[in-house]
């Protein structure tokens, strides 16, 4: 089931959880979507600022599988 997250800090907490499996990064012209797959929900964060998206990509946990989808 999908859930949308509005806060970057909340998204990072979800990404650091034990049951977080992977992150998909979808880029388009207007925004960047980060989707983290946990055991129950697929959490989505939408960012319109490209610089913030790059910083968030750098701050993802190192053990997490990251896929970039164009």
Swiss-Prot record:
Record has Ribonucleoprotein as a keyword: yes
GO cellular component: cytosolic large ribosomal subunit
This protein's record includes keyword Ribonucleoprotein: yes
Superkingdom, taxonomy of origin: Eukaryota
Signal peptide feature range: none
Keywords from the named record: Ribonucleoprotein, Ribosomal protein
Molecular function terms from GO: structural constituent of ribosome
Pfam families linked: Ribosomal_L38e (PF01781)
Annotated GO biological process: protein-RNA complex assembly; translation
Chain segments annotated as coiled-coil in the UniProt record: none
Family indicated by similarity: Belongs to the eukaryotic ribosomal protein eL38 family.
Protein name: Large ribosomal subunit protein eL38
Gene: RpL38
């Amino acid at each position: 089931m999908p859930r949308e997250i509005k806060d970057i800090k909340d998204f990072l907490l979800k990404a650091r959880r034990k049951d977080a499996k992977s992150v998909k990064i979808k880029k388009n012209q207007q925004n960047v979507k980060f989707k983290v797959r946990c055991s129950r929900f697929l959490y989505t964060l939408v960012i319109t600022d490209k610089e913030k998206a790059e910083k968030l990509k750098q701050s993802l946990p190192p053990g997490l599988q990251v896929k970039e989808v164009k």
